[in-house]
Regions:
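Bacterial N-terminal signal peptides
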Residues: 11-24
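Glycan-recognition and catalytic cores of secretory/periplasmic carbohydrate-active enzymes
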Residues: 32-36, 61-90, 99-101, 105-108, ...
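Contiguous beta-strand segments within globular domains
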Residues: 33-57
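N-terminal secretory signal peptides that target proteins for export/translocation
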Residues: 1-9
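Short, flexible loop/turn segments at beta-strand junctions in immunoglobulin-like
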Residues: 95-97
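Boundary at the C-terminal end of the N-terminal hydrophobic targeting segment
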Residues: 25-30
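Beta-strand secondary-structure signal
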Residues: 51-53, 92, 105
């Protein structure tokens, strides 16, 4: 397959993201401004809501024609409404009744007003592939080969096999200055560091996408090194980060280090040229609970692939339960940025949402009543999820079951 342009991890938290609409100008009427149509450039799913924006001119009627020029849908535009943010007025053409796959054009007042657009069950398949491939481009600790990365091939950087324990992350089993290994994982959106808290919601997004739509993702070929093995590519990609996350747990007490970073951000250099000392920094309740939630759902979803990942489901379950126990014993440890550390903080001081999410995932994994009771104690009405607000993720997982 072709190599998509790399995107940041943060930009693809939702694999259902819409693309920007593109305008197409039709022939101008005898008087008045030219009409412009803004329509999804990738197309529409057959059963989906389908809208186009019509700007300019006193247009009133629209029709959709197929590739043979036959009119397949007619409609009347409502009055235009003004959107102050853009300073423009537009009317909305509702094309939702169009459900037969094919390629079409939208005409406004009899003039051809749009480039062809598609109605196709696979309209967003390429978008999903590109969004998933973005995670590959953000892999740490590995070279990106031309066969998989095309013009974005690069040497390996940040092996992270000798990471120093910062004083803020020290414990009896891992004193300050000792060294641990935590390779792989994904770089953050704008730097070469790796953070458990926001990495957690990114990994969960991939795992949830697989759980909700296995038939769609089972056949995707992302052109990553693991493509063609017996595991769906979306799970192979998530595993790259799960392996790193497992290394972020302090085996001595079950707590989870908040981040693996330099003391300061790297400059604008390629990964192999960024060679500053790397540190495990901090421990906190949010990191432990996000880790527990991700490991719990991963334990469930990788169980059918035990042959490819021997021992991993049991290991992830044990890791999730250990992190939960640590969080129960340390329920309010907020991450505080040490004075000598100047990378992303990703701090949080309210943990009900993390407790609810982790409890939901552990309940689905184990069926144990203690986790359901914990979910009931901590759950709130779901809001829009983000790295700092993850309560809705537990609701999503529970609703699916």
């Amino acid at each position: 397959m072709g190599v998509p342009r790399p995107l940041s991890v943060r930009s693809v938290l939702s694999l259902a993201a819409l693309v920007a609409a593109v305008p197409a100008a039709c022939a101008a009427p005898a008087s008045g401004p030219a009409v412009q149509v803004r329509i999804d450039q990738l197309g529409f799913l057959p059963g989906a809501h389908k809208l186009a924006l019509v700007e300019g001119g006193p247009a009133r009627a629209f029709e959709v024609v197929d590739e043979g020029g036959q009119v397949v849908l007619r409609g009347t535009l409502p009055a235009a409404a003004r959107w102050e943010a853009s300073g423009s007025e537009a009317a909305v053409a509702d094309l939702s009744a169009l459900s037969v796959p094919g390629r079409y054009r939208l005409r406004v007042d009899g003039a051809v007003a749009s480039d062809p657009f598609a109605v196709d069950p696979q309209a967003y398949a390429g978008l999903a592939d590109a969004a998933l491939k973005a995670f590959y481009f953000n892999r740490a600790g590995t070279a990106l080969a031309p066969a998989h990365a095309g013009p974005y091939a690069r040497p390996a950087g940040h092996p992270d096999t000798e990471v120093e324990i910062h004083p803020s992350a020290a414990s009896p089993s891992h004193p300050a200055g000792s060294v641990v290994s935590a390779p792989k994982g994904w770089y953050d959106a704008g730097d070469y560091n790796k953070y458990v808290v926001n990495s957690g919601i990114s990994t969960w997004t991939l795992l949830a996408a697989w759980e909700h739509y296995p038939e769609f993702f089972r056949g995707r070929d992302l052109g990553i090194p693991e493509s063609g093995d017996a595991v769906p590519d979306i799970l192979d990609e998530a595993w790259w980060n799960l392996e790193w996350m497992l290394a972020m747990q302090d085996a001595g007490d079950g707590g989870v280090w908040h981040k693996l970073t330099n003391l300061r951000f790297d400059g604008e250099v390629m990964p192999e040229r960024a060679t500053a000392r790397r540190y495990m920094v901090g421990k906190g309740t949010a990191a432990a609970l996000d880790f527990a939630a991700v490991m719990a759902i991963a334990s469930r979803l990788y169980a059918p692939y035990e042959a490819r990942f021997p021992g991993a489901p049991a290991r992830m379950r044990a890791a999730a339960e250990a992190a939960w126990r640590w969080a129960q014993a340390h329920p309010d440890v907020a991450y505080r940025q040490p004075q000598d550390v100047h990378t992303g903080a990703y701090g949080d001081s309210r943990f009900d949402d993390e407790f609810a999410w982790a409890a939901a995932e552990l309940y689905l994994l184990t069926g144990e009543a203690q986790y359901w009771r914990a979910f009931e104690r901590h759950a709130a009405d779901p809001g829009v999820p983000s790295w700092a607000s993850v309560g809705a993720l537990g609701w999503v997982s529970l609703a699916h079951h």
